[in-house]
Amino acid sequence: MKFMKYAVFFYTSVGIEPYTIDSRSKKASLWSHLLFWANVINLSVIVFGEILYLGVAYSDGKFIDAVTVLSYIGFVIVGMSKMFFIWWKKTDLSDLVKELEHIYPNGKAEEEMYRLDRYLRSCSRISITYALLYSVLIWTFNLFSIMQFLVYEKLLKIRVVGQTLPYLMYFPWNWHENWTYYVLLFCQNFAGHTSASGQISTDLLLCAVATQVVMHFDYLARVVEKQVLDRDWSENSRFLAKTVQYHQRILRLMDVLNDIFGIPLLLNFMVSTFVICFVGFQMTVGVPPDIMIKLFLFLFSSLSQVYLICHYGQLIADASSSLSISAYKQNWQNADIRYRRALVFFIARPQRTTYLKATIFMNITRATMTDLLQVSYKFFALLRTMYIK
């Protein structure tokens, strides 16, 4: 499916087959399993080392280092949770994709009726931009220590950088000036790629599915509004029955979508609240300009991720509620009285807005981002107060 290609690319890079592909060979599946568990084990070891470092930094009174490593841990938690929930919900996701393929427009005529090209261009543009942003973020972090070494020590010769690693971790041995440095550098870069790809792939998958849901809602709204009604109750009732059935299929898609993504989205919002707070705090404690650029990129990427999810949540809410307005715009005045009475019930259902949900606790719209930023700022103010004291 064209909408899914970018998400599948990033899932493949971490060894995940997000939904069943009948044509996939057993050899490819075996390689995917090996790659997946290599990613998981490596990432788990790295985050365990970061957690140990957090304890050491806190006990030694290194407040800034503790906050820094907390932002790294939060980033990993979001990436791992998204990967594991997609891996766990593979059967449900496969059924969802099959249903999307079943109602996908076939042929040039249907594609034009659905305005497929418009939605596909929008999804592709957002997917590419978002994937590039996160890729630049993670590789800026991964290669930052190497670039510092090459620029400051080798090129400009203004200070000695030495061997440094991208992320703060606890090590029970001295890795400086020996071969283990290169192993650790590779493992940390590998872990950074895994965590970023886990987030990119799941966010792009959500983007692809949400775009198709909006496309079907919009198509149904146009069909309902443009339907020419007359006094033929038999024909009008058949049209209304088909409309209700189509609407129910879209609502079932949303139920499955919320079931698959609900918990990962809730974790995403909870952790992102603290990550935004931690990164913002680091930017206010007098870091060098090069570190400031890195932190700004981290903050901007985290905000972009939250906005992307909230944006698609808003699109789904708007598209679902607009169906009742389209039904009211019909020329129902010309229809049989029985159709008018039935139409009242149809109009009532879309007035109960369909939301993208982070479980039962949160309906996601653009207002959700405002709420998240308010909470994040409160924690930021608390953190600043603790640091000053």
Swiss-Prot record:
Main location: membrane
Alphabetically ordered keywords of this record: Cell membrane, Glycoprotein, Membrane, Olfaction, Receptor, Sensory transduction, Transducer, Transmembrane, Transmembrane helix
Subcellular location(s) per record: Cell membrane
One GO term describing the cellular component: cation channel complex
Extracellular side: 55-66, 152-199, 281-290, 381-389
Stretches of the chain found on the membrane's Cytoplasmic side: 1-33, 88-130, 221-259, 312-359
A biological-process GO annotation: signal transduction
Entry membrane topology: Multi-pass membrane protein
Glycosylation-annotated residues: N178
Transmembrane segments: 34-54, 67-87, 131-151, 200-220, 260-280, 291-311, 360-380
A Pfam entry, by short name: 7tm_6
Highest taxon of the lineage: Eukaryota
One MF term in the entry's GO annotations: ionotropic olfactory receptor activity
Record's function text: Odorant receptor which mediates acceptance or avoidance behavior, depending on its substrates. The odorant receptor repertoire encodes a large collection of odor stimuli that vary widely in identity, intensity, and duration. May form a complex with Orco to form odorant-sensing units, providing sensitive and prolonged odorant signaling and calcium permeability.
Miscellaneous remark of the record: The atypical heteromeric and topological design of the odorant receptors appears to be an insect-specific solution for odor recognition, making the OR/Orco complex an attractive target for the development of highly selective insect repellents to disrupt olfactory-mediated host-seeking behaviors of insect disease vectors. Odor-evoked OR currents are independent of known G-protein-coupled second messenger pathways.
Family: Belongs to the insect chemoreceptor superfamily. Heteromeric odorant receptor channel (TC 1.A.69) family. Or49a subfamily.
Summary of subunit composition and partner proteins: Interacts with Orco. Complexes exist early in the endomembrane system in olfactory sensory neurons (OSNs), coupling these complexes to the conserved ciliary trafficking pathway.
PANTHER family hit by this protein: ODORANT RECEPTOR, ODORANT RECEPTOR 13A-RELATED
Protein name as it appears in the record: Odorant receptor 85c
Gene source species: Drosophila melanogaster (Fruit fly)
